[in-house]
Amino acid sequence: MVRGSPNPGHFGLPVRLKKTRQAAGYSRLALSLRAGCSDATVGYLEGGQRWSSLGTVARFASALGCSAVWLAYGLGTPEEAGAVDIAGLGLRLASVRAERGLTKADLVEATGLSSAAILGIERGAEARVDTVERIAKALGVSPGWLGYGIGPMVLPPHRRTRSAPATASP
């Protein structure tokens, strides 16, 4: 029996990052140098101690030659690397919010974020992967599309099927 809600996609980011880094043959230090960040950032993210910004995840994905959407949220495949549009996050957020007829206050209530956070993102501030996923869930859109401008705007619903019960042969 399935209970509760599935974990957010960004929960798998630490494992995806570590496995992809190791498969590429990079140490934490080597990846940090390729991505232009500190090796502590790689360690914190792989350890699940911090959630990174969309930009940092995009730099890791570029350095590893994989998809930023896959690395951040587990959507698509690792090989689907493409140009990301982080700068368009605010515009995508504002347009979907307006299309859904939601005020900033409605979105604040639905996400638990502050109004300053929502306003900041709509005005171009960078956001963390966990924040974008919370907003995407509240708006009913794909976090990959909202954060990076990649993939379908709305994900197809996940359907879990039960296997038929085994029957005894006569």
What name fits each language-model region?
Residues 17, 28-32, 42-45, 71, ...:
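Conserved hydrophobic/aromatic packing and binding residues within compact polymer-binding modules
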Residues 1-23, 77-99:
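A short, Lys/Arg-rich alpha-helix, primarily the initiator
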